[in-house]
Amino acid sequence: MQLSIIIPVYGSPESIKELCERVSTSLRGLVDSFEIILVDDECPDDSWSEIKKTTQTLPNVIGLKLSRNFGQHKAICAGLHESKGDYCVVMDCDLQDLPEDIPTLYEKAKEGNDVVLGQRIERQDKKFKVLKSKVFYYFFNLLSGLNSDPTVANFSIISRKVVTAYLSFKEQDIDYTNVINWLGFDAVKIPVRHAERKYGESSYNYWKLME
């Protein structure tokens, strides 16, 4: 069984090496093989140089560099296109998603679940950011007719069947979690830990979700 870890990168260059080392440690002995795909979304910092250094020291790491800043969800799509795993994990680069929780997601997927979503029961973001998230998703769900959960972000595992369906989806201006929701595969949610941001500040905002 092969596992692909898709990580869109924008900011947090300090976290890249530690993140990949912790992912590698968490996956040793869990699967036959794995790959970590870091997608540089044209970061205006040292992220690409850190990605290149990491690919030279960790053989399972692959670096992709986009030609311009396309946004987080298109970076995820680029990583999925490159992936070869029977299952793909999507996670953020800032170490708020804990690599040590990947085995829990994987074991749940092996029970026959095509989509397993990490549910952040105790978010470690600032209270104002959590409030903005709740307000955004309230109105987003009201207008879209979807049922998006503000406690669920990118941290998830999906089967190859779901990856294929995701990549055939032609709409480019909708985010990863809502595409997964729209595709209609049975999904289960499991609690995952959520760490405080260790390096830098988030560049993500809810206006980007509306683009």
Provide a role label for each language-model segment.
Residues D40-S49, L95-Q96:
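A conserved acidic beta->alpha catalytic loop
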